[in-house]
Amino acid sequence: MLDFTEASLKKVLTRYNVALEKALTPEEAAEELYPKDELIYPIAKAIFEGEEDDVVEGLQAAIEAGKDPIDLIDDALMVGMGVVIRLYDEGVIFLPNVMMSADAMLEGIEYCKENSGATPKTKGTVVCHVAEGDVHDIGKNIVTALLRANGYNVVDLGRDVPAEEVLAAVQKEKPIMLTGTALMTTTMYAFKEVNDMLLENGIKIPFACGGGAVNQDFVSQFALGVYGEEAADAPKIADAIIAGTTDVTELREKFHKH
């Protein structure tokens, strides 16, 4: 007769050197990642918790203690958001958590700007949109929040954006990257039209595409397409671009799964 008692299972796990570990809560997992600096810690924690008032309170205390407001964007706000993104990537927290944290991050950035008298340097500009005919913008909103939280200037064109408007925005803003999201299979073909318009006008920037209707095979069919499986891939692709990987083929090698 098979013995499925706890004691028996422990013996099996011990035999095969498998540790019985209690899963960490999201809060416990985050606690292990927070910086130890007593002024930075409460800010990073408030970012993770999505508490805008606590973020501002922590920033105020840090500034009064002599921290530079602009430096706090990288040293505290970005650090806190880094914890959020890491735990999201690991499946510990979910998209609503990321959105709340991104809002808290943006509130913190505004507070730092107001108290410095200077405008923090952005990494670069990214134009974002939802495919023409598609009104589902939750994915796009997450992408824009993550890009802003990671130091990018985002030009958000909204949802149901005609290809001509996308082209005009790219020509005006000269971004390092364009993003597009689509939830409906009937709308994702607009990305090919955008791609062709860009090429016809001599524009060869990476076009990161994602969303429920989109897959890697589809995005790989057009010249500028780079597939982002998750919203969190957007800032990673942008970071790769500003680090020097601007060739679409190289970006695909880095981010595509097959």
Swiss-Prot record:
GO molecular function annotations of the record: cobalamin binding; cobalt ion binding; methionine synthase activity
CC terms in the record's Gene Ontology section: cytosol
Entry-linked Pfam families: B12-binding, B12-binding_2
InterPro entries: Cbl-bd_cap (IPR003759), Cobalamin-bd (IPR006158), Cobalamin-bd_sf (IPR036724), Corrinoid_p (IPR012741), Met_Synthase/Corrinoid (IPR050554), Meth_synthase_dom (IPR036594)
Start and end residues of each B12-binding N-terminal domain: 30-124
Superkingdom as given in the UniProt entry: Archaea
SUPFAM superfamilies cross-referenced by the UniProt entry: Cobalamin (vitamin B12)-binding domain, Methionine synthase domain
Family: Belongs to the methylamine corrinoid protein family.
Self-association and partners: Heterotetramer, composed of 2 MtaB and 2 MtaC subunits.
Name of the protein in its database record: Methanol--corrinoid protein
Originating species: Methanosarcina barkeri (strain Fusaro / DSM 804)
Taxon lineage: Archaea, Methanobacteriati, Methanobacteriota, Stenosarchaea group, Methanomicrobia
